[in-house]
Swiss-Prot record:
It comes from the Bacteria. Belongs to the class-I aminoacyl-tRNA synthetase family. InterPro entries: aa-tRNA-synth_I_CS, aa-tRNA-synth_Ic, Rossmann-like_a/b/a_fold, Trp-tRNA-ligase, Trp-tRNA-ligase_bac-type, Trp-tRNA_synthetase. L-tryptophan binds at residue 133. The gene is trpS. HAMAP family: Trp_tRNA_synth_B. One of its GO terms (molecular function) is ATP binding. This is Tryptophan--tRNA ligase. PANTHER family: TRYPTOPHAN--TRNA LIGASE, MITOCHONDRIAL (PTHR43766:SF1). NCBIfam families: trpS. The lineage of its organism: Bacteria, Pseudomonadati, Bacteroidota, Bacteroidia, Bacteroidales. It catalyses: tRNA(Trp) + L-tryptophan + ATP = L-tryptophyl-tRNA(Trp) + AMP + diphosphate + H(+). Keywords: Aminoacyl-tRNA synthetase, ATP-binding, Cytoplasm, Ligase, Nucleotide-binding, Protein biosynthesis. Homodimer.
Length: 327
């Protein structure tokens, strides 16, 4: 069975974009692959989160993953910092990484531009740590978005370079994995782009009905169509895209027909969209609250996930040490 690895930084609650863009695919993948899903708390240290927030954010993501249906009996769910072997492999890969290639990565240049007063070594070597996360389990597939494709190419480069330096065929070159039709891009509520964690742009799986309704009713629209069958402007198309995802085909066609004959009332569209989002998220939200209240269950998932992840990582690291010459 092929091994798949995917990580998420614990920087905020999961939203509809996370669910339809990734998690829904994970629910299928956990039955077909040897899956390792981890919460990347080490990666979050580049932005220096408050110590009190680290554990809380990890527990939040863990509870939300479980509430969505990721099964710890079928997939290994673990916290990155519980697998110390990753740091040792990170060290070895850094010894074979070159300053110039790390400085040229788009992700580093973009983050350095956004936070010029915090251009730390963790940002620079982000691709190396990401490669260690993947290669520690000798994964062959990694579900990532286009924004991570360059880092995936770096991971393949580091795997290939290790094999070349030590004249072995040990690390596979991991492939970027597209989940296919199950992955959907969910637009944000601010009129453009995909849904993200910025304030006002996202609907979180843990949001209650009142919060969801308030966010949807504030979504950007225009004055309405004046010409039948006209092209929808991006903010309006975004609302229809969300409607297509969470509503029935009948509901979508109803509002599409109203738009095309210039009789649509955006208030009615937003009310329907909010109601359908609430209907979808309410069972997940209730499950999140239930899981968060069960500290013993969360502790057990973390402990057992760490044990399974470390067992896999230790096997890889033992061979890596032998190949390098630590015997």
């Amino acid at each position: 069975m092929e091994t798949v690895v995917s990580g998420i930084r614990p920087t905020g609650n999961l939203h509809l974009g996370n669910y339809f863009g990734a998690i829904r695919s994970f629910l299928d993948m956990q039955h077909r692959y040897n899956c390792f899903f981890f919460i990347a708390d080490w990666h979050s240290l580049t932005t220096h989160p408050h110590p009190d927030n680290i554990v809380r954010n990890v527990r939040t993501i863990l509870a939300e993953y479980l509430a969505c249906g990721i099964d710890p009996e079928k997939a290994t769910i673990y916290v990155q910092s519980d697998v110390r072997e990753v740091l040792e492999l990170y060290l070895y890969l850094n010894m074979n990484a070159y300053l110039g290639e790390l400085e040229r990565t788009t992700s580093f240049k973009e983050k350095a531009r956004k936070q010029p007063n915090n251009v730390n070594a963790g940002l620079l070597t982000y691709p190396t740590l990401m490669a260690a996360d993947i290669l520690i389990h000798r994964a062959v597939k990694v579900p990532v978005g286009k924004d991570q494709e360059q880092n995936m190419e770096m991971a393949r480069k580091f795997a290939r370079r290790f094999n070349t330096i030590y004249e072995v065929d040990f690390f596979p070159e991991p492939e970027s994995f597209s989940p296919g039709a199950t992955a959907l891009k969910v637009p944000g509520l601010d009129g453009s782009g995909k849904m993200g964690k910025s304030e006002g742009n996202a609907i979180y799986l843990a949001d209650d009905a009142k919060t969801i309704s308030k966010k949807v009713m504030k979504a950007v629209t225009d004055a309405g169509p004046e010409v039948p069958n006209s092209v929808k402007p991006e903010p309006v198309e975004n609302l229809f895209s969300m409607l297509r995802i969470v509503s029935s085909d009948e509901v979508y066609r109803h509002f599409d027909d109203l738009y095309n004959n210039c009789s649509i009332r955006y208030g009615d569209l937003k009310k329907q969209l909010a109601a359908d989002i609430v209907a979808f998220t309410t069972p997940i939200r209730e499950r999140i609250l239930e899981i968060q209240a069960d500290e013993a269950f969360l502790d057990r998932v973390v402990r057992e996930g760490a044990e399974r992840a470390r067992e896999s990582a230790a096997r890889t690291l033992a061979e890596v040490r032998h190949i390098i010459g630590f015997r």
